[in-house]
Amino acid sequence: MARILAFDFGTKRIGIASTDPMQIIANALDTVHPKDVVVYLKKYLNTEPVEAFVVGLPRTLQNEESSNAANVKAFINLIKKNFPQTPIYGVDERFTSSMAFDTMLAGGVSKKGRRDKATIDKISATIILQSFMEQKQNGTATMIFKPDDANS
């Protein structure tokens, strides 16, 4: 099986998480600057097969698009353009940053460590990926780009 990659998009950093090859476990992978993400992914895909991408979709508590939605859409379009054969799924990312912080707190991470935004972004991406894996298993995953749509 191929891996699945998930992204927690931010204008300063993109948190990235990956499944294991059997798609059982979600692991924090890395953080990259948005301008470096395509090069990073091309290198990664040269060494690891990837079945799908998952992008955290920013929503407000009222279930409306957040102020970062336009940036995330631009990121999705960048991925579509550069990796047109890879499907993209969307997952509601509300509360992932606070869940990541709580995870760090429960894990005994020091106060200094909890201030590391790159770590929070990686953990947020992992939470997004775990949510997707649950949705995929119960048939509720939302595909936002199919490779067949590449020519649309």
Swiss-Prot record:
It is found in: Cytoplasm. GO terms for molecular function: nuclease activity. It is an enzyme of class 3 (hydrolase). SMART domains: YqgFc (SM00732). Pfam families: RuvX. HAMAP family: Nuclease_YqgF. Could be a nuclease involved in processing of the 5'-end of pre-16S rRNA. It comes from Cytophaga hutchinsonii (strain ATCC 33406 / DSM 1761 / CIP 103989 / NBRC 15051 / NCIMB 9469 / D465). Its EC number is 3.1.-.-. This is Putative pre-16S rRNA nuclease.
